[in-house]
Amino acid sequence: MRAKQRGVALIVILLLLAVMVSIAATMAERLFSQFQRATHQLNYQQAYWYSLGVEALAKKGIEQSYQDSETINLSQPWALKEQTYPLDYGQVRGKIRDMQACFNLNALAGVKLTPDSVKKPYLLTVLQALLEGLEVESYQAEVIADSTLEFIDKDDSVRTAYGVEDSYYESMIPAYMAADTWLADASEWRAVQQVGGETMNKALPYVCALPTDQWRLNVNTLPAEQAALLAAMFSPTLSPESAKTLLEGRPFDGWASVDDFLAQSALTGVDNAVREEAKKYLSVDSHYFELDAQVLVDTSRVRIRSLFYSNDKKTATVIRRRFGGISERVSDRSTE
């Protein structure tokens, strides 16, 4: 009898031991999970503060460029291509982009249209010519240009030949309405009629959405690879190839004035009316810049996009700051 009791006692002890081991393992797992969570939070906070430090550095670089020259050009410190810098337990990678080296879609909100208008507004022709230069079919390009204006103007009436308003978007699935205000980001352009994924990918390097309906293209910072935008401003006289050659021959520190730029031989054949119209939207300085940086601390990553604005060409102010973005997700095309 005692032998049987000893066997039962041993089984009970083994069961208790198994339960204790299981509880200990669970506690250890939870402790490790909490430790990892705390580590990730600390790393993310560190990356966040690093990103603000990068923003402050970019601000100084922009302000220094204003002090060093009367113009904004690609020879200045801010214009370095994407750089990577080491940090404690990580790194930062980023670049600054001149936001006046692209077509401001919100500038269309300032276009004045009247019922008896015969001639298409200049900015609409520029956007249409840009899209055509990017191999978008002519009719589709005109529809996109007109629809973009209708999408961001303040009324809900159709004033262009090929544009659409709320009634069109309400018929889609899911239904939505035209913004009737400025775009907050160029990615919102995807909601406009006929702006498909292929068109968006082609045009995105050439367009932007600034918080203003004003637009000036800085001819000193427009990359030669994006010469199609310059060609669109002088269409149909200036070809993309000639525009690219013109930008590749740009002085090291850029042109001193818009008149110096317009005096280039490549533009001598441009119609005077087109020249004068384009001149209104050309510049050799800039007021808007965007920092796009990614900070990596261990396995925690923070992406920051900061929009700087200067109204006095002395100090730069952050008027918009965003964290995260499109690059946070890498799409697996094989599953689509």
UniProtKB/Swiss-Prot annotation:
The UniProt record lists the keyword Thylakoid: no
GO BP term, example: protein secretion
Entry-linked PANTHER family: TYPE II SECRETION SYSTEM PROTEIN K (PTHR38831), TYPE II SECRETION SYSTEM PROTEIN K-RELATED (PTHR38831:SF1)
Record-stated family: Belongs to the GSP K family.
Record has Transcription as a keyword: no
Periplasmic-facing ranges: 29-336
Keywords, alphabetical: Cell inner membrane, Cell membrane, Membrane, Protein transport, Transmembrane, Transmembrane helix, Transport
Subcellular location: Cell inner membrane
General function of this protein: Component of the type II secretion system required for the energy-dependent secretion of extracellular factors such as proteases and toxins from the periplasm. Plays a role in pseudopilus assembly and seems to control its length. Interacts with the pseudopilus tip complex that is critical for the recognition and binding of secretion substrates.
One cellular-component annotation, GO: plasma membrane
Primary subcellular site in the record, as a coarse category: membrane
Membrane-traversing stretches: 8-28
Protein name as it appears in the record: Type II secretion system protein K
Naturally occurring in which organism (per UniProt): Vibrio cholerae serotype O1 (strain ATCC 39315 / El Tor Inaba N16961)
Name of the gene this protein is made from: epsK
NCBIfam families linked: T2SS_GspK (NF037980)
